[in-house]
Regions:
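Conserved catalytic core of the tyrosine transesterase superfamily
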Residues: 1-291
Length: 291
């Protein structure tokens, strides 16, 4: 490990950055250094601008991805090297506005009913019922399901923020059936990786992607469907059912409209007053099946 890499790693860890962000930021700085065949502390804003242009023109990266690259470089120069950073010289790219693909409630029901396995069905139902991100889904623990308060506790979400989301009665029933289907009862993870004999590791996000893709194909859906699609559907369908926009914002674990670090918090009373859109779906009954 080089001295600069160690310095950056310590700065990231000291600020409690997520492991995925740490790996990404370090990889980006290493890529930047290799591009110019020089240590990153000997590169200046001119090289950063050339690198930014290359990311767009040659690598064809999306504006949101380029923003992550610049954020990594900015962290390295301002936090690790304690140097200045001129936003005017290296501005963040303007992000294109993309309208997310939204499924109707009927299409969501078709998607869930078309799940290849009961396990996949439970994953899809949990995504739609809670609006969680796929990484949050894979790291749900058994103890995160609070059937007394009817909430699901999300630990260490994006930005290392914890939050509670509503626990749909229909989802609670599905999770109990999921538990009964498991031949080996895990001690920690709600969705254990089946490839691990001891069930001591959670499933990968790849499994969640596969569950969505396979179900969409089996359901004959023409729209692009991925785990985040169900998160968008969760928010949109709640809004259509009259839920408060700020309440939805909290349930999703998003920043406020000004993109600050301040998070809104919802009271238990308001949380319980918001019904999950899963409860209004008409799903086919599935017979219990061991996993």
């Amino acid at each position: 490990m080089t001295h600069l890499r160690k310095m950056m790693l310590e700065e990231l860890q000291r600020r409690n950055y997520a492991e995925t962000t740490i790996r990404s930021y370090i990889r980006i700085v290493e890529d930047f250094s290799q591009r110019f065949h020089r240590p990153p502390d000997r590169l200046d804003p001119q090289q950063i601008r050339e690198y930014q242009a290359e990311l767009f023109q040659k690598r064809k990266l999306a504006p949101s991805t380029v923003t992550v690259y610049l954020a990594a470089l900015r962290f390295f120069y301002t936090k690790t090297l304690k140097k200045g950073w001129s936003v005017a010289e290296t501005p963040y790219p303007k992000r294109a506005e993309h309208v997310p693909s939204i499924l109707s409630q009927e299409e969501v029901a078709r998607l869930i009913d078309a799940a290849r396995t009961p396990f996949h069905r439970t994953l899809l139902m949990t995504l739609y019922a809670t609006g969680v991100r796929r990484a949050e889904l894979t790291h749900l623990k058994i103890t995160d399901i609070d059937s007394q308060r009817m909430v699901v506790h999300i630990q260490g979400g994006k930005g290392r923020k914890d939050r509670d989301v509503m626990l749909s009665p229909k989802l609670l029933q599905e999770l109990r059936e999921h538990w009964r289907r498991l031949k080996r009862k895990p001690s920690e993870w709600l969705f254990p990786g089946h490839r691990h004999p001891t069930n001591d590791r959670p499933i990968s996000t790849k499994v969640v992607w596969q569950a969505c893709r396979n179900a969409a194909q089996r359901a004959g859906l023409q729209k692009q469907v991925h785990p985040h699609t169900l998160r968008h559907c969760f928010a949109t369908h709640l809004l259509e059912q009259g839920a408060d926009l700020r309440n939805i914002q909290v349930l999703l674990g998003l920043n406020d409209l000004e993109q600050t670090t301040i998070y809104l918090h919802v009271s238990e009373r308001r949380l319980n007053a918001t019904a999950s859109p899963l409860d209004s779906l008409k799903l086919q009954e599935k017979s219990p099946q061991a996993e």
